């Protein structure tokens, strides 16, 4: 599984264009987050990395594709803190993290590291 860090213009419709072209290619977006300050960016996870590459190329946006690791944590207070602390103690720098789904007592996460 991969994540895509997409650099966008900070203007109305920039994210919509990316989501539309990915959807029109029949690709499902599984998770995502966006943020804007001086510039705008969105990070998404899809069910088809190759198709996502082609879709993003077709609209000329700048992106970076990174491998996404996954883990299943207990869905309780503090479990994410324990997980991220273990990464830090092993010298692993966290680049991104997603809540992929919750299922009863479990939370499935996706994350990338440097």
Segments predicted by a language model, with ranges:
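A conserved regulatory-domain signal marking ACT and ACT-like small-molecule sensing domains
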Residues: 1-114
């Amino acid at each position: 599984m991969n994540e895509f860090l997409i650099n966008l213009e900070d203007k109305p419709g920039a994210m919509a264009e990316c989501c539309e072209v990915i959807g029109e290619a029949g690709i499902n977006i599984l998770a995502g987050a966006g943020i804007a300050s001086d510039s705008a960016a969105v990070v998404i996870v899809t069910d088809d990395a190759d198709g996502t590459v082609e879709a993003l190329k077709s609209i000329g946006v700048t992106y970076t594709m990174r491998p996404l690791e996954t883990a299943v944590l207990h869905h309780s207070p503090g479990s994410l803190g324990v997980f991220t602390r273990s990464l830090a103690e092993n010298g692993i720098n966290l680049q991104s993290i997603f809540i992929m789904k919750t299922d009863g007592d479990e939370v499935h996460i996706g994350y990338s590291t440097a």
